[in-house]
């Protein structure tokens, strides 16, 4: 098994995660597909033969297969990928897979880069529109607030309409809005465009991890996810470095032009080179087009035993289910709060560093952006650390010869939980101008190192704990941490003015220190806690069922089963209470008589 960190929220479909747990992605209990014998060949109109190699990638070899079924409405042919299917993303050459991971990581980097690069032009925006520091900072907060809503919508839509279509349209619109922000004539229009760009452009935050899950099996996915997971943290760290110099020399409009250019180039590159990778969508469209070509009825094996699901139904679940799990499951709530605090602290740095280094040490706007170099180094160290952790976990899984427990994911979080307060206190109390500037920046290295270790390890822990509910768990975590990331920069200026640099910088350090026990407690008592959590216990039951019976279970199925069990327990408890109350009344009547 491999480490499977996911920085964004609803990124992996429940089907992908569930099927990974039993070691089979798309072929659960399905008969093998063999070439049709002559008597089973379909008769296809000659005028359609030229379409095979052009329309929808339907080749004659797809038709001439002996699929299970009879080709009728009652018993449709159940199609799956062929053994050497060129559209099966799992069979792509390794160099292509890594190239696609790199491109999607760049798209994610472009999105998160734009969230913080804006800070490099805040001084010019304040002068241009005559506004306060807090109003100008809304440009960061509203952009990050868009991360709360965007992935909740784009993740389910990518499962209905494919990864490629969703990425194409969302990043195209995000590029247009980013370019529009460069020409904004008022602060209101600038802030609205920033929010829309963050909401619509956040598709890669859910698309990229899903694309990795489409292409790599679980044994290979760890390294790919380690490579990708740096993008959501490197982007915000690099943004102020580039933005500070460009904003200082060319102005804030050119800075937004750079964001639009970065987004536009990655949009073109990903659109041109990355194919559709989501297997259920590919097979669903293939079945539809084969039905049109032959007059027979085809259906994807991945859709055969599932009721049809509309976009409205999936969006409703995507918008409501994460919040249900967030507030009903203690593990989800506590880990999400912890991740949100440290994630918000990272975005607080974009308002705090100008106070500490530009205002406190007299650095220029461009040089002030270089203070984020420590965070960049810390993120890189965490990625290297997780590459080694991935190998350690894989060795432990092989030597055990049995499924690993979710708590086995937590050692990096334990280490990271110690590094975060160490780094934050180090930074807070070495910000005096009399102390060399490199000393507080070294503190930010430890903070960023610990931040990514905790982030990735806790997300892995949640995925392994909830398995079939993982997509909704990731959505809940993503939404909450984005709210914290949007809120923290807004009160930073007042906090630093009221408390002073050292004590204001210590506030997030104390919060992180209060969270240190959580990874230790989950590591020691996590199993007992999970068994007392309704949905975690149901996820464990579903996982056991999939391993023993080799059946695929969807998130909807598991949610329905959990809700039925909850209703049954509630009914039984009410019935028991009513019976007990009636029994007491009977005894009282007897005594009265």
UniProtKB/Swiss-Prot annotation:
Annotated compartments: Cell membrane
Skewed-composition ranges (Polar residues): 9-30
Gene3D superfamilies: MFS general substrate transporter like domains
Entry superkingdom: Eukaryota
Documented applications: Fusaric acid is phytotoxic to plants such as cotton and banana. It has been shown to induce programmed cell death in plants. In addition to a mild toxicity to animals, fusaric acid exhibits acanthamoebicidal, antioomycete, and antimycobacterial activities.
One Pfam family it belongs to: MFS_1
Induction per the UniProt record: Expression is positively regulated by the secondary metabolism regulator LAE1.
A single MF term (Gene Ontology): transmembrane transporter activity
SUPFAM superfamilies: MFS general substrate transporter
Disordered, as annotated region: 1-45, 570-593
Record's keyword terms, sorted: Cell membrane, Glycoprotein, Membrane, Transmembrane, Transmembrane helix, Transport
GO cellular component, one term: plasma membrane
Membrane topology: Multi-pass membrane protein
PROSITE patterns documented for this protein: MFS
Disruption phenotype: Strongly reduces production of fusaric acid.
Glycosylated residue positions: 19
Disulfide topology: none
Transmembrane segment boundaries: 98-118, 135-155, 167-187, 195-215, 227-247, 254-274, 337-357, 367-387, 410-430, 438-458, 468-488, 503-523
Family the UniProt entry places it in: Belongs to the major facilitator superfamily. DHA1 family. Polyamines/proton antiporter (TC 2.A.1.2.16) subfamily.
Job description of the protein: Efflux pump involved in export of fusaric acid, a mycotoxin with low to moderate toxicity to animals and humans, but with high phytotoxic properties. Constitutes a self-protecting mechanism of the fungus against critical levels of FSA within the cell.
Name of protein: Efflux pump FUB11
Gene name tied to this protein: FUB11
């Amino acid at each position: 098994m491999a480490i499977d960190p996911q920085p964004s929220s609803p990124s992996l479909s429940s089907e992908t995660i569930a099927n990974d747990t039993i070691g089979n992605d798309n072929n659960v209990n399905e008969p093998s597909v063999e070439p049709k014998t002559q008597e089973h060949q379909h008769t296809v109109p000659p005028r359609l033969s030229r379409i095979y190699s052009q329309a929808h990638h339907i080749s004659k070899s797809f038709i001439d297969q002996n699929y299970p079924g009879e080709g009728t409405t009652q018993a449709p042919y159940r199609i799956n990928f062929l053994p050497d299917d060129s559209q099966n993303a799992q069979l792509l050459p390794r160099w292509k897979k890594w190239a696609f991971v790199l491109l999607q990581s760049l798209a994610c980097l472009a999105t998160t880069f734009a969230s913080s690069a804006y800070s490099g032009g805040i001084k010019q925006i304040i002068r241009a529109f005559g506004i306060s520091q807090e109003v100008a900072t809304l440009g960061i907060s509203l952009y990050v607030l868009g991360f709360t809503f965007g992935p909740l919508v784009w993740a389910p839509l990518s499962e209905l309409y494919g990864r490629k279509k969703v990425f194409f349209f969302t990043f195209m619109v995000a590029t247009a809005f980013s370019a529009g922000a460069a020409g904004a004539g008022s602060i209101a229009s600038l802030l609205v465009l920033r929010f829309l760009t963050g909401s619509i452009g956040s598709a890669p935050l859910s698309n990229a991890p899903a694309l990795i899950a489409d292409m790599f099996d679980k044994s290979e996915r760890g390294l790919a996810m380690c490579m990708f997971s740096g993008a959501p943290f490197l982007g915000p760290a690099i943004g102020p470095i580039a933005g500070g110099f460009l904003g200082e020399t060319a102005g804030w409009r050119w800075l937004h032009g750079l964001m639009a250019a970065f987004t536009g180039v990655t949009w073109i590159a990903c659109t041109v080179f990355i194919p559709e990778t989501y297997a259920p969508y590919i097979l669903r469209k293939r079945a539809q087009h084969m039905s049109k070509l032959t007059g027979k009825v085809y259906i994807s094996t991945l859709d055969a035993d599932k009721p049809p699901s509309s976009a409205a139904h999936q969006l409703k679940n995507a918008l409501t289910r994460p919040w249900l799990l967030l507030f009903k499951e203690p593990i989800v709530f506590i880990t999400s709060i912890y991740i949100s605090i440290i994630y918000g602290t990272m975005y607080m740095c974009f308002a705090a560093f100008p106070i500490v280094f530009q205002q406190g040490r007299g650095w220029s706007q461009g040089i002030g952006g270089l203070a984020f170099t420590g965070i960049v180094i810390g993120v890189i160290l965490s990625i290297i650390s997780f590459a080694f952790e991935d190998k350690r976990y894989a060795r432990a899984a092989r030597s055990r010869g049995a499924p690993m427990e979710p708590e086995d994911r937590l050692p990096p979080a334990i280490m990271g939980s110690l590094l975060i307060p160490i780094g934050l206190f180090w930074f807070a109390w070495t910000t005096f101008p009399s102390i060399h500037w490199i000393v507080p920046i070294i503190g930010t290295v430890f903070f960023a190192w610990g931040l990514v270790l905790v982030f990735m390890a806790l997300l892995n822990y949640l995925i392994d704990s909830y398995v079939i509910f993982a997509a909704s768990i990731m959505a809940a975590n993503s939404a909450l941490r984005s709210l914290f990331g949007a809120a923290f920069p807004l009160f930073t200026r007042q906090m630093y003015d009221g408390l002073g640099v050292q004590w204001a910088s210590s506030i997030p350090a104390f919060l992180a220190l209060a969270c240190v026990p959580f990874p230790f407690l989950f590591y020691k008592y996590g199993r007992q806690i999970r068994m007392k959590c309704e949905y975690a216990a149901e996820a464990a039951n579903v996982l056991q069922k999939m391993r023993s019976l080799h059946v695929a279970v969807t998130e909807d199925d598991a949610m329905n089963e959990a809700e039925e069990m909850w209703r049954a327990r509630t009914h039984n408890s009410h019935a028991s209470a009513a019976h007990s109350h009636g029994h007491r009344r009977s005894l009282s009547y007897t005594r009265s008589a």
